[in-house]
């Protein structure tokens, strides 16, 4: 079967004449090497490659409503858990050989897959490790999106004005690992589709709802309306995390502060309880990503034990 070309126009990718595309389901046949028989994208200065590379900028992501997923782990999770949002997958010949299962899953899902030279891959993203996907941005902003994400929730992480993309991505990953039902980024926080955030989630961005663009007051109101106890993580807390079993057993949301300034006073005043993590060594504090992981896992453990006793 020869590669097929989409008949659907896309003004983001309007140079379709240079788009060698393989769309599944199909069998990959290889004679000498994993990309044999398939044309390779080799022009790093083409308009298409430039537009994909441009998605590293926030204004381009907002305009085109799509973002980059870089690296094998992120691309694999996008293909497995959000194939309907994956618009294109790009991989080098070396990456195709190392990660043939991603090729197979993408083709089986009917996705467009493109083999590129390393030079083209580097032009699109120097951090892609040979694998890159362009993914449609999910519309999950504002109060209605928060209410929908919180329906039936037991554990939620809320980031208030988080600015560090690595920390934001790590918190999304920790929330996913702890079994949280959603992550809310209060208005003024970093864009969760920024490349470093996406990389730091290691694919968790596609495992649970991530809601943005909601004011802090509206977020707390939605949390209370969903029946969640709102806990603020702060070093000046009235409760020690490891002595607050009754708080942790409840369905709850953790408010997590800005890396430099912690939680704002309005967040502390709206919380049902302010909880601190004890420091046993000489460190002044934990960074927000580490603190989030500790708090979320403490709640997950307490909820599981309480459920087992019920």
Task: Provide a role label for each language-model segment.
Residues 71, 164-171, 286-291:
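Amphipathic alpha-helical repeat scaffolds
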Residues 231-283:
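Active-site/ligand-binding-proximal alpha/beta "capping" segment
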Residues 107, 131, 200-204, 248-251:
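Short, hinge-like loop/turn segments at secondary-structure boundaries
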Residues 1-165, 188, 309-310:
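Arg/Lys-rich RNA-binding interfaces used to dock onto structured RNA substrates
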Residues 41, 67, 160-161, 184-187, ...:
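Glycine- and other small-residue-rich loops at beta-strand/loop junctions that grip anionic moieties
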Residues 3, 114, 140-237:
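RNA substrate-binding interface of SAM-dependent RNA methyltransferases
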């Amino acid at each position: 079967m020869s590669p097929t070309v989409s008949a659907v126009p896309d003004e983001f990718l309007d140079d379709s004449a240079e788009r060698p595309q393989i769309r599944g389901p199909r069998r990959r046949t290889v004679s000498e090497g994993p990309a044999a028989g398939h044309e390779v994208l080799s022009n790093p200065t083409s308009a298409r490659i430039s537009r994909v590379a441009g998605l590293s900028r926030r204004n381009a992501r907002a305009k085109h409503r799509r973002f980059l997923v870089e690296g094998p782990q992120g691309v694999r999770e996008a293909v497995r858990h959000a194939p309907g949002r994956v618009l294109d997958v790009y991989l080098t010949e070396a990456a195709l050989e190392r990660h043939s299962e991603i090729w197979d899953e993408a083709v089986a899902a009917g996705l467009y897959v493109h083999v590129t030279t390393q030079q083209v891959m580097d032009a699109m993203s120097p951090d892609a490790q040979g694998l890159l996907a362009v993914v449609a941005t999910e519309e999950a902003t504002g109060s209605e999106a928060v209410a929908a994400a919180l329906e039936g929730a037991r554990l939620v992480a809320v980031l208030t004005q988080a600015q560090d993309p690595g920390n934001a991505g790590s918190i999304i990953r920790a929330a996913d690992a702890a079994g949280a039902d959603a992550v809310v980024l209060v208005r003024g926080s970093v864009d969760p589709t920024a490349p470093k955030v996406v990389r730091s989630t290691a694919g968790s961005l596609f495992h649970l709802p991530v809601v943005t663009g909601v004011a802090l007051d509206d977020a707390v109101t939605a949390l209370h309306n969903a029946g969640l106890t709102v806990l603020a993580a702060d070093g000046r807390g009235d409760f020690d995390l490891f002595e607050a079993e009754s708080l942790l057993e409840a369905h709850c949301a953790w408010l997590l502060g800005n890396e430099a300034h912690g939680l704002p006073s309005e967040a502390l005043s709206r919380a049902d309880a302010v909880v601190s993590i004890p420091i046993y060594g000489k460190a002044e504090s934990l960074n927000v990503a580490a603190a989030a992981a500790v708090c979320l896992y403490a709640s997950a453990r307490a909820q599981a034990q309480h459920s087992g006793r019920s």
